[in-house]
Amino acid sequence: MIDKTAIIHPTAEIADDAIIGPNVVIGENVKIGSRTRVIANAFVEFAEIGEDCTISPFATIGSEPQDLGYKGEPTKVVIGNGTIIKENATVHRGAACGDFTTRIGEKCLLMVGTHVAHNCVLGDQVIMANLATLGGHCHVGFGAWLGGMTVFHQNVRVGDMAIISGFSATRQDILPYSKGEGRPPVPSG
């Protein structure tokens, strides 16, 4: 179902059973999978969104990367099945390097106000709590938990199942299966 107030670009491919809410803007080069809900006032462009996803109000998916070298190249966001992106979250499309893509795995949860910058790669089942921020080119492994208001500098790698406590910030990679907190995160527990 597509609400009559939604604005849909002619190139968009939307599954017949997807739900597009009021005042949603679906821009060019978008694919939306079966049973996915894009709720009121969300903005999506240059993105492939899997099945059974939820994009909450005022989320922005696929806008231009914050990269001074970006010159309008054809880049995108790919979001796996079952992912939930909450209110005011932002996911920028890739910059013109690597595979030109920002990737979010399956069954991830990006809570209110999170930011995933250009060319980031999130594994499956990643949780980003409110206001967690990833700089460009970060890689987050399977099942990692990023606490509220955490900040990760560009190119940081977070290992599988790592847990980073809220209010932490790092320029350093985080080991798999570790727990850390602080600036930079110090192993704990």
Where are these regions (language model features)?
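Structural signal for interior beta-strand "rungs" in well-ordered beta-sheet cores
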Residues: 2-181
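Conserved beta-strand-loop-alpha-helix hinge in the C-terminal portion
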Residues: 183-189
